[in-house]
C-alpha cells in the first residue's frame, strides 16, 4: 500500500465500485498472512467460508483463517467481514449493515462459548467497511425523534460519521476485536485510492492486530 502526499489518501487494490470490489482486500490479507506462516489452504473466502452458529445453523463469513495441526485438529484463528457500501441508498442499507454485523458477532461468540469450534481459543473478529465518499454519504442527516431524543453523537451526523461511530462502538463493546473504516469516491476507487476518516479506524492497526493474533495462535498450535 502506498501513501499519497496528502497523508490521508492511501493506495490499495480495493475499489468502491464493481461487484467484487473487496476481492483485493481478501487477496491482501491472504498475502500478509502467508508471511506469518499461514498457507493459502488455511484461508477461506469464496469456498468453504462457513462456520456453525448458535441462533442459526451456519454463517458465511467473508474471510476465515482455520489452522490444522499435525493431528488433524482444526482451530479457528480469525473471522473477518469485508463490506462495501455504495450509494445512492445509504439510510436503510446502513441500518441493515449494523443489524447484520451485530447479529453475526453475537452468534459467533455464543457459538464459541458453546464449543462449536472445539479446542479453539477466542478467535480474532474483524470488520472492514469501504464506504463511497460522495455528497450523499458525507452531508448531515436529520434524525426522527418522535418520542425520545437520540444520543447526541447521532444528531446531524452524516452516514459516514454514523459508520465511524458504529465501527468504533463494536470494538468498544467487544463485539469485534478490531474494525476499519475506509472511504473512496468512484473515480478514486477505480485507481485503488482511499481515505481514512478516523485515526483509530485506520487499516494499519487493523492489519497489525490481525497478524499479531494469528501469528501468536499459530505458534501455540504448532508447539502443542
Swiss-Prot record:
InterPro entries recorded? Restrct_endonuc_II_XhoI
Q: Which reaction does it catalyse?
A: Endonucleolytic cleavage of DNA to give specific double-stranded fragments with terminal 5'-phosphates
Q: Which GO terms describe its molecular function?
A: DNA binding; type II site-specific deoxyribonuclease activity
Q: Name one GO biological process term.
A: DNA restriction-modification system
Among its keywords, does the record have Lyase? no
Q: Which domain of life is it from?
A: Bacteria
For this UniProt record, the keywords arranged alphabetically read as follows: Endonuclease, Hydrolase, Nuclease, Restriction system
**Protein family membership:** Belongs to the XhoI type II restriction endonuclease family.
Q: Which named protein is this?
A: Type II restriction enzyme BstVI
Give the species.
Geobacillus stearothermophilus (Bacillus stearothermophilus)
Amino acid at each position: 500500500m502506498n501513501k499519497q502526499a496528502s497523508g490521508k489518501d492511501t493506495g490499495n487494490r480495493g475499489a468502491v465500485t464493481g461487484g467484487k470490489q473487496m476481492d483485493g482486500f481478501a487477496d491482501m490479507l491472504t498475502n500478509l498472512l502467508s508471511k506469518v506462516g499461514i498457507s493459502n489452504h488455511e484461508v477461506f473466502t469464496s469456498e468453504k467460508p462457513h462456520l456453525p452458529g448458535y441462533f442459526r445453523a451456519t454463517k458465511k463469513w467473508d474471510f476465515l483463517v482455520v489452522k490444522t495441526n499435525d493431528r488433524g485438529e482444526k482451530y479457528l484463528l480469525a473471522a473477518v467481514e469485508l463490506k462495501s457500501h455504495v450509494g445512492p441508498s445509504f439510510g436503510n442499507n446502513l441500518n441493515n449493515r449494523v443489524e447484520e454485523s451485530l447479529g453475526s458477532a453475537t452468534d459467533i461468540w455464543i457459538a464459541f462459548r458453546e464449543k462449536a469450534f472445539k479446542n479453539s481459543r477466542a478467535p480474532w473478529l474483524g470488520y472492514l467497511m469501504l464506504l463511497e465518499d460522495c455528497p450523499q454519504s458525507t452531508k448531515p442527516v436529520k434524525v426522527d425523534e418522535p418520542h425520545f431524543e437520540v444520543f447526541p453523537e447521532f444528531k446531524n451526523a452524516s452516514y459516514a460519521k454514523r459508520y465511524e461511530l458504529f465501527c468504533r462502538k463494536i470494538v468498544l463493546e467487544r463485539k469485534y476485536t478490531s474494525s476499519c473504516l475506509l472511504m473512496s469516491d468512484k473515480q478514486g476507487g477505480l485507481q485503488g485510492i482511499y481515505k481514512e476518516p478516523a485515526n483509530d479506524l485506520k487499516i494499519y492497526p487493523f492489519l497489525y492486530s490481525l497478524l499479531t493474533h494469528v501469528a501468536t495462535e499459530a505458534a501455540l498450535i504448532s508447539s502443542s
